[in-house]
Amino acid sequence: MKRSGIADLPLHGGRVPHWLAERMARLGTAITETIVHDYGASAFLSRLSDPFWFQAFGAVMGMDWHSSGITTSVMGALKRGLASRADELGIYICGGRGRFSRNTPQELRVIAERRGFDGEDLVRTSRLTARVDNNAIGDGFQIYLHCFVLTAKGEWAIVQQGLNDQSGLARRYHWHSPSVRDFVAEPHTGIVGENQGTIMNLVDAGARPAQTAMLDIAHEHPDKTLNEARHLLTLTGVQSTGSLRENTFRRSVKTDNEAGVQSTGSLRENTSRRRLEMPGHHDVRPENINLKRLGAVLAVAYERDLHDFAELLLLENLGPRTLQSLALISEVVHGAPSRFSDPARFSFAHGGKDRHPFPVPLKTYDESLNFLRGSLDAARLGDKDKLDGFRRLDRFVRAVETRFDPEADFKAVIAHEEAISPSLDGRSVFDDKPHQPSLF
């Protein structure tokens, strides 16, 4: 078992409006079902454990492309949307934000009893991962969201998020069971986060001596521990002013590299984890996206010959704007991990609730949903042609990207989206009444 990724995200307030929350639940369910249909439940958990894919997944559903709320809204949408399909798809989601996270143990026990798992072992895993991210990594983030995703075969992934009020950031931690072998030796598969300077990482592979020393100290008499600490402070020239723990910690951080103390910047160099750091600005900028990849999507949607071929693949007449969205959704379903290095690009499927990069085009969103749901329903009845065409759409877009030079004109694309927004029932939170539903 290993933490698969980490992401740092700017803290944003507010809630997801009802009109978007309902659509996110439906689209999230449809995307999940497509992945499970084509690749299996294990593949869905692998994707969920990648912080870059997770960010693209949220962006393609119309959530803010970079804020802390993407974690809460995506997991809330999945929990609501998959609840009635859990046994059919073999995917169960437990926990949530705040008080809902405290329901995780009981929810796990109920599922374990139904599926024949060791419920207490799952509960132990849930608690250990939360403790590692809350306590064993001194990065200043307090966990407030904990979601445990379990498959019918017993594989699991965990997505949890902490906040740091002082920095105004949230940090998302990803875990995945096939990668984790030791809870106290580099267990994460990924972390999404911004550099917070020097931290103490007690689950680093090099931290075994520090872990052993801490266990030894815990068994010593308190008086002996304090005397040795005072002696150490005298030798290092640190004056005891009453804040003994703080001074000792800072001294250790500066000198004890062998004890697993390291800068967050070296995390990416020393481990195989995926690390995502989102910028502080709210608007989408050209440097946030791969313009050639976006250009390929737009070429397929708007160039007549390419558009006609894409329609042949999908066996349906579609407008260019809907085809643009479906091409990006298809990439989320079928794309390789390297395709998600620019998650902001996926906000060009359905915009963002805060108008970044443009308002959510509800008509396009619903057309995308209807196509995907219709393709899935047909596949359940044995007709897989549309779903197969949806897979080939991703390959076609990548072929266009490789064989042509389709770099997008960023300003022109934004201007076009803003111009057509009224005709597509473009909507944002600024158009809504003050009261909006909570995420869970």
How would you label these PLM feature ranges?
Residues 1-440:
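HhH-family (HhH-GPD) DNA N-glycosylase catalytic core used in base-excision repair
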